[in-house]
Design a protein with these regions (language model features):
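Terminal leader/tail segments of proteins
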Residues: 2-124
Length: 124
């Protein structure tokens, strides 16, 4: 079972309304179960207690007990960014961490420090 998320706060610049599919995705990661709906899939890997998240069969995140590794899956789309930010809000600090886009370029914000987006970035 993943940590209690009730103490996490959301980034005020993001909508507090989460897509139903994203809520279900987070529940699957939180409950360490396999899950699939439409274009999104969670695969729980029991050997190392991680969950891999896929969008259109492209790996976009790995969530472990104390880290989250993110990828764009080859597509820097609005949907990919939405899935990643939902995961960040659930398993990182949604106030200081996130993915955003400016002038068609993706950026990572980690502890309020901004850098260019890189695949394989780890929030720990």
């Amino acid at each position: 079972m993943r940590p209690d998320l009730s103490l996490h706060t959301l980034n005020p610049s993001q909508s507090p309304l989460m897509r139903k599919i994203e809520s279900q995705m987070i529940a699957a990661v939180n409950n360490s179960v396999n899950w699939k709906s439409a274009n999104t899939r969670v695969e729980f890997i029991e050997e190392n207690n991680t969950s891999k998240v896929y969008l259109h069969d492209n790996h976009i995140a790995t969530v472990g007990d104390d880290f989250m590794e993110i990828f764009d899956g080859g597509w820097q789309s609005v949907t990919t960014k939405s899935r990643l930010n939902s995961l960040i809000n659930a398993f990182c600090n949604g106030v200081t961490d996130g993915i955003f886009q400016k002038d068609f370029q993706w950026y990572i914000r980690d502890n309020n420090v901004t850098q260019d987006f890189v695949n394989g970035y780890i929030f720990a």
